[in-house]
Amino acid sequence: MRRLTYRAASFLMRKSLANILLFSMASLHLHAQDVTTLVNRVRTKLDKVKDYHATGDLKTDVAFLKVPVSRVNVWYKSPDRFRIKKEGGISLLPKGGLSFNMRSLLMTENFTAVPAGESSVGGQPTKVIKLLPTDDDADIILTTLYIDEKLELIRRATTTTRENGTYDMQMDYGRYGPWGLPDKVVFSFNTKDYKLPKGVTFEYETGEKPATPEEQLRNKKGKVEIRYDSYTINQGVPESVFK
């Protein structure tokens, strides 16, 4: 009788563990579906913007560099044409073509979305979602998005690439939020991945000139901030702008 009772208890325990495992797997699958749906909702919102021309102020904060705040013009044309031009004719070209374009964060449609909990960005609650490209040859290895689920806005994104290191973007939104376009973008990166624009000069704190600019920039952190004051959306942008 005791043996039967033990066997029955063992069977019930194994059955319970199997049910828990199945429930956990089903729950993970549903969560993955939910975050994929959220990413696609954000993509649909950004896809409403076919092109824009924006103006704003650009501030560069990089060690050993003297870069004044500049007025800039920014152009975008779907799906991946993007250019920043400083007034005076100097184009700003981060190494590898790193872009402040929101749509570039969701360029690939071949990805696996993995839920990674919740967090807060600038006091706003967000869903944390990791995007893993299914293409083994893709330059992007991992993108972590912090999405405001209620407003369908990307408030922060951290991207790791094969060729250009890891960079982070944090966004603030205002009147252009319904288009998914930020009022402010702060772009943080490792300075070894940054290509110096023409006309930028070094400032030396010790009076001693370093061996090379590359040595001065090695293992330093940099930030580029753009504060937009206006966008002209879906009014057409000539292809000549990008040449």
Task: Name what the model sees in each region.
Residues L28-A32:
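Sec/Tat signal peptide C-region and signal peptidase I cleavage site
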Residues Q33-K48, L58, K66, W75-L153, ...:
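Flexible, processing/modification-adjacent segments and terminal tails
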Residues L4-I20:
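Bacterial N-terminal signal peptides that target proteins for export
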Residues P125-F242:
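Gly/Pro-enriched, hydrophobic low-complexity segments
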Residues D61-A63, K192:
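Sequence/structural signature of outer-membrane beta-barrel proteins
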Residues H53-G56, V67-V69, I84, F187-F189, ...:
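Extended beta-sheet lipid-handling architectures
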Residues N19-S27:
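Bacterial N-terminal signal peptides
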